Amino acid sequence: MSGRQRTLFQTWGPSLVRGSGDSGCGQPRSPAMAEALPEEDDEVLLVAAYEAERQLDPGDGGFCAAAGALWIYPTNCPVRDYQLDISRSALFCNTLVCLPTGLGKTFIAAVVMYNFYRWFPSGKVVFMAPTKPLVTQQMEACFHVMGIPQSHMAEMTGSTQAVNRKEIWSSRRVLFLTPQVMVNDLTRGAVPATHVKCLVVDEAHKALGNYAYCQVVRELVKYTTHFRILALSATPGSDIKAVQQVITNLLIGKIELRSEESPDILPYSHERRVEKLVVPLGEELGAIQKTYIQILETFASSLIHRNVLMKRDIPNLTKYQIILARDQFRKNPSPNIVGIQQGIIEGEFALCISLYHGYELLQQMGMRSLYFFLSGIMDGTKGMTRARNELSRNEDFMKLYTHLQSAFAPASTSDASAFQRGNKEKKFVYSHPKLKKLEEVILEHFKSWNAKATTEKKCHESRVMIFSSFRDSVEEIAEMLLQHRPVIRVMTFVGHASGKNTKGFTQKEQLQVVRQFRDGGYNTLVSTCVGEEGLDIGEVDLIICFDAQKSPIRLIQRMGRTGRKRQGRIVVILAEGREERTYNQSQSNKKNIYKAISGNRQVLRLYQGSPRMVPDKINPELHKMYITHGVYEPEKARSVQRRPFSSRGGIKASKSNKDGLLSEEEFNLWSRLYRLGDSDQVKGVALPQSHFPSLQEDRVIQDPTTRIHQLSLSEWSLWQDRPLPTHQVDHSDRCHHFISIMKMIEGMRHEEGECSYELKIRPFLQMEDVCSKYHAPRNGYNNVASVASSAHQKSSFRPSVDAGGSLTVIESEEEHADTVKQRDSKWTKITSLREKPCRAGRKGQTCEHSEGEGEDGDAGSSDADGQSPAEADSQVDPPSGERMADVGGISILGAVTEEDNHPGTLQMECQVTNKSCARYSLDSGYSSFSDEKSVSSNLFLPLEEELFTDRAAEQFYNCRPMTEDVLANVERFLSRSPPSLSGLSDLVYDVTQGCEFDNASCSPYPEHEHSPRPVSPASHSAGNSQQNLESNSAKRISHPTEKYCLPGTTHNKVSDRPSFCESDSEGHNIKYQNSGSNSCAQIQADLENNFVDKNSHDDSEPPVLFTDEDESLLLFEDDFKNIEDGPEELNGASLPPFNSISQPLRVSGKTLTSEMPPVSHFLISDELLLDDDSEPEDQIVCGAKSWKCQEGVEDGQEELRTDGQTFDCSVDLFSVTFDLGFRCSSGSDDEMLAGASDRTRTLGAADVSGRHSDKEIKDAGGASGPLGRAISPIPTETAQWSPWAQNKEYASFHVASSSPVKQRVRSTPLSKSHASSKTGAHMLKTLDSTKEKAGGQGFKMALNPRLGHLGFSVEETKSSDQVFVHQSPRRTEVEHLTSESEDDVFLRKTKKPKRNVLKSPEDQKNNEVDSPIHAVKKPRVLRSELASSDDESENFGRTCPRLEHFKGRNRNIRKGSAAQKNRSQVKTMARRFLDDEAEVSGEDVDCVSADEEDESENEQDSSLLDFVNDRTQLSQAINDSEMRAIYMKSVRSPLMSTKYRMVREKRPNMNIFSQIPEQDENYLEDSFCVDEEESCKSQSSEEEISVDFNLTKDSFTDEDIRYKTRYAVKIKQMNKKQNYTRPRKKLSRIILPDDDSSEEENIPKDREHSVAGGHAAAEHTQQGQLWASGPSGSSVPPQVLSDPSWNQSSRQRLQVQPSITDAVPRTLNVKAQSHNKIKSASPPCTGVESRKEYGNHPVQLKADSQEHSDTSAAPCSTSLLHVAEGHTAPRHLQEGNRACILVDSREITTGLEVISSLRTVHGLQVEICPLNGCDYIVSSRMVVVRRSQSEMLSNTSKNKFIEQMQRLQSMFQRICVIVEKDREKAGDTSKKFRRTKCYDSLLTALVGAGIRILFSSGQEETADLLKELSLVEQRKNAGIHIPAVLNTSKLEALPFYLSIPGISYITALNMCHQFSSVKKMANSSPEEISTCAQVNHQKAEEIYKYIHYIFDMQMLPNDLNQERQKPDTCLTLGVAMKELS
């Protein structure tokens, strides 16, 4: 052989010899030869490398030839021939080993595992056992048998974390685990499947059906077949069929079967005597059986007569036979049985099955078990109502049941503890003769065992096991044996709890019982089938089977518990009859199995493909060797030992030293002086017993003993006031705090007099932090003077938590404490309009309203100064313990105080019924009440005049937790039908972003008391917030004697001051007169007599007027109960509507008259945010027809101009993003700021619209009067008043009734509402100042998107980032009044005709029926600008299309979209189109999706908004067809809403400027040319999904250019090949969500996956048929493939404008579209960009399938996925860039084949992650949800599914639902799929919401669809390219990112990988977030705003168990951090 032919090793080996030979020739090498040497060496290296690779050929699988020459058999255990033979056989073939229990199956497994462990050094050896104890036992056995190092072995069960398991798989070689863990790890990809070389399956007879064993083998085979399987079982199966199934599932190629009779087994098996004892039933049991058979005949005969049950002997029928008959009846129902008869037969079947189960119990277990079963039916615990009713009517049954009840009812109360106590007094009743026989056998056994008093027997106490199938029988046996203690020490052994009423054993308890039984604690164990297999229960001498098992497996398993080490005995106790026959049949089956396996091999088909695993040339030889092993250490012990550091503090765990780390000298000193010895008389230490005064002392008093040293906390106090020396570990901060406290205590101990500590900290005292509470007694004395005596005393706003929701408030001031006197209170009941069940409070508790009777007519009180203090006691806990039953309502108990002619002070006890409000209320007010009588102000209840503190306002900024709860009450209120709309007028929505609050707690601005203009609360420092205002209580109210009459009460006079928390308000005389009924209520406050000095009159508050139902927290009497709407529950108060009859409400110098009840002034107003330093108006008259507002306002107030802004923080704070469910009239406020032409219109008494006569309403004086206060402008930094408030022509109210409740939700309660009783004055949405930090930063206001209903537009300016709400195209006359603040709000009311084409809206007539409020009707006027319509959006699931721009802007504000970009400040509505066109297309490109349409497609379309389409970007770069569609859309008549329904083309991509501008080359495609086929749009349902997307036509020049670069050429070529001329098709506008249809131009010939939505798709019609073809070919005809229209429809995105609104939070209300609309226009569903716009609106699924019945293919839901031709290997796979799909961990159990196919068949990278509701994430923007057809059919899971869709829409741009056909069970006949109404409506709703629907025939096809979706997303550069596995540092940030609302898992992953830290992310701009997180700009702005939202720690709730915020609600970072912690 030449050197060139030798290998490297051959060349190197003999080179020395060869070299010497050659040198002997004496021929020197030539230079050429020398030069060739390097080349020869390279070739040799190549050959050597080839041989090395060949040796590592996968065919050998890493087999080590050196180790493979031998196989080791241990001799440290006795060698048994059968074990040796079976081991040799199992090494070379997949083997099933069947050995009786106790004969060494585990030993054989250990031998085989060890040899494969040697042969394959890099392979894995896996042992699987069904239970954890078996896993542990096998691991220990392998160590003892073969000595496998423990460091190479690992045990993995479900308790092992998945991350740890993946590490174990990579580091360990021999693994012991349960099959479920193996399945999970295979699915996760954690198992190196190709490295598994040996798989051992214990208890292999379980490998049936879809058990985890079968799944493991199926998964492994997908990776490799090169592994050995060893199956172990005592019995291969219950019959031949089961054995064959095991062989097939486990790939068994050989069976090694040994029975107890086998010759090679006999020498090693101990004798097992099997005794069969047959017991007759007996007379008593026989009689009961006879009676029971009669009962069975009664019910079974009915089925027999109907020919649905076979005619057989009734006693011989079995439960199984009846079940089979029922299944047969269901499959083939008789044609004569229809309708209700079928249900009756089903009920009879169920009843017979239950009765026959009881019959079996009677025969096998006895009467007691039967009684327990029947009692479960009769007492209703089993929920079988029909069976109970039927049985109750049967006389024989009731007699039998009564008899059993008398015998066993007392025993039924006995439990296991009673058994263990051995209740011997009670006589045991033997319910079955078998029990007596069992007792005899056991007693005989122990008697005979104890008689053998040999030494050997004494060492081994006998143990007995009793098996019974039912727990009731187990308990009965244990109770019987307890009578024979202590001879029989019995314990039960059952499995886990199987239901609510059963208590089982946990695994820990099971192991404890087994251990005690094995160790001798018990000698008798009564067990269910749990003890049959697996557990090592030690040697058992006697096995008793109390019942027979039909399966021989269970019988053999039971017998295997004995006869292992010594002789065993098995006793089977059988009842005569059926049980005996069952046992005999079982034994026969066992013999047949052994005979079939061992005798006739042809019966079973064995697996022929078992790999040899050993190379052919190698034949391992047996090598017996003695194996030694060390001591086995349990896993837990080793894990503890390996832990180098302790879990706390990182201190190294080390053994403690006796010297305690003391030096020798120190130790000796301690030992000599301090060590306690016996002489010290201290033998132990004890803690002193604690004493709880509230608990009874039941403990036993122990005698004190001197030997016990009682520890004391104060004993070492002298040592605890200084830090002691430390060693290595320093003192903690907690320790230092403790030391300082102890030092302070020690210092204070010796003080006398005034406390030095108090003096020291008094300068730092924050009064709002001081908490106190006061329980005012009923009819008792309130010592207010004593309460108000200390310095700087303010009101406390801390509610008592234990008060059940009631609050106590007393306000007083230091300066006027001398005027406060004790008064006797008489309580008056003023109840809320409607009482409701308490939501968060104590259930079932009611509040008794004390009805006091006022005796005095004079409501005034006078003191020395002629001033009257007002007190408001919101009693926290009434002495009688009453609780309010109505949530959100306030029960106001007015106390008319009488003393010294001062009966005018009204004490209002306002009991907040919302307990959660009281619980969450925070104390941010003053409370210097140091004594226990200190009272807490109710920071919830708008007690108008009683709360005098100027600090009250700021306290409302701390009530966010309470408002959240109350807002939840509002949500409940909304579940009722809405009020009518006819008379309601729009809410003027005031929004500002310019307000700056310097103080989060909203100081009371005392220094501005005399300021000529109002001052922003934020303008005061924290120091100022500590100042006190002059007490209003020093002033007196002059109360004319007025009485009010409430139904059911006597006339009381109530004096009240209409101020809640404004100390600077003037006293107003308010007169309430309820003339709508016979009762009258007059509350008068003196406007002129102020409570403060006259020089502080600038601080006066305007009088209280009353808002409508949306603002006022009013409490009406019973006369208001005719109002249909209950009060809104807001901020703990009740918001009732008003009566239809209104009386004048006068606000003058003396009186303010209203028809409202006396408590109607309990309002939430904007006073919390405002400082009203203006004069009150002299007179404002609210007449029956008009408001009279006389100018009496000082000139100084004319200067006080501010932009009245309202803040809605409900979007940011709360999850209350729902709607009232109706639109409110916008027309009623047409003249809100109109000119004099509208002045003559007056407001009727019943008109709630808020329209006022201009000539009667003069200048409101800077909103100081009720009109101005109604708008309640929020002070901006310029502190100016609203222009409309100063419009002398028209100072109108802002009516809240036109807006949904969600818009009017306040984050804070508002104080003094100023509005007329029927005038719906606008209740401000005040933003908690605590939500905004101090500093010059303005409010980051998040507009509620539902503002769109108001018809306002919002314009933002770059300079000030302010929001303008426009409703009028004309500037008002007061525009010049505004200051430099640009937050001008202009509102103009308009009326729009209703135009809901799908649903008849409520008209004015209907509304009048619904509501007692009758509005003055106005002639309808056509809209001239965007505004909302009352009637338009009656569909709760719609957003108003005319307000889409507003919502878009609103959304941009709310989500932090690009407000900083240059925008034109639009001043008028007339120019909105131009401004918006430039603004949206230019600056908002980043935040508006390319395919987004800012309108709800399912909305009425008659608005003039559609005439001027300003919601598109088409002015920048559009194609012609788009322009045509826009034009056709714009020319629709505003009055004929459906005259033209134009098809909307796909709008340009978001990155429009990166695309080539499109050319206008073809006039035919000009936007002004309408295709002639457009007229046919609505005529052909066949064409509905034939949407022309062929943009490669030459007329589309730019599209042609763009698409030809990718796929267009191929498309054209395909069309040319098939000689197909494409006809002109309708260009239905199917919007691809942020997608480009060019990406899907690739239409393969071989595969088409279609998706059908709606009816056509699901029914597989030809329009939207599901072509579910596998990779082999396409089921679509070639002509269909060549049809461009089909091509286009295949590319459509199933996108319909998502009708995602917030009317009903829990339902997807997708309004069903009309036939014409769906056909004529695929509505521009926007993908997620537009869905994000509605992100916080729950989708409404209210699809009516009947409306869709005529639109078979209507929903345009066909989405056809295309695979490129020849996609055998995807492009990315060829390029090495595999597509990645994230799969939810829950899919491991339900979608195992999907995951496996994705990974093995399609080669995708699959990562298992906890996706929290997302089944599959295929890209950064698309999520796929997999649902089975059965899940879609059922109505039970519909709501859950809807909620899931809602949540996903807030996180993903695209959602796809795969509806998968249910898997058919083996042997079941295929059932015809029957659609249900729920199924159709759900599909329709999904389509309407823009969700793509795909249909799949199975999991394999689902995987194929997922792959195609992933490839499409990959081509769009949206694929997942980041690893799903995070390192430890990044893993810590993941939970925080996931806590951000609306963030998906993939987005969080992107943020983890792209941002090095959370800090970097928090400091990133929205643009950076958008880039790194791969989200659109809007989502990035949302994240940015969430992170940067200013948070006040005082906003944290007391109780963290609040309802979670919805994902789209802007939470604060502090709340997120709190959740993380």
UniProtKB/Swiss-Prot annotation:
InterPro entries: DEAD/DEAH_box_helicase_dom, ERCC4_domain, FANCM-MHF-bd, FANCM/Mph1-like_ID, FANCM_DEXDc, Helicase_ATP-bd, Helicase_C-like, P-loop_NTPase. SUPFAM superfamilies: P-loop containing nucleoside triphosphate hydrolases, Restriction endonuclease-like, RuvA domain 2-like. It is found in: Nucleus. A motif (DEAH box) lies at residues 202-205. Disulfide bonds: none annotated. Phosphorylated; hyperphosphorylated in response to genotoxic stress. Keywords: ATP-binding, DNA damage, DNA repair, DNA-binding, Helicase, Hydrolase, Nucleotide-binding, Nucleus, Phosphoprotein. It catalyses: ATP + H2O = ADP + phosphate + H(+). Residues 437-612 form the Helicase C-terminal domain. Residues 638-657, 837-886, 1002-1049, 1244-1273, 1296-1319, 1369-1441, 1447-1466, 1615-1700, 1712-1732 are annotated as: Disordered. ATP binds at L99, P100, T101, G102, L103, G104, K105, T106. DNA-dependent ATPase component of the Fanconi anemia (FA) core complex. Required for the normal activation of the FA pathway, leading to monoubiquitination of the FANCI-FANCD2 complex in response to DNA damage, cellular resistance to DNA cross-linking drugs, and prevention of chromosomal breakage. In complex with CENPS and CENPX, binds double-stranded DNA (dsDNA), fork-structured DNA (fsDNA) and Holliday junction substrates. Its ATP-dependent DNA branch migration activity can process branched DNA structures such as a movable replication fork. This is Fanconi anemia group M protein homolog. The lineage of its organism: Eukaryota, Metazoa, Chordata, Craniata, Vertebrata.
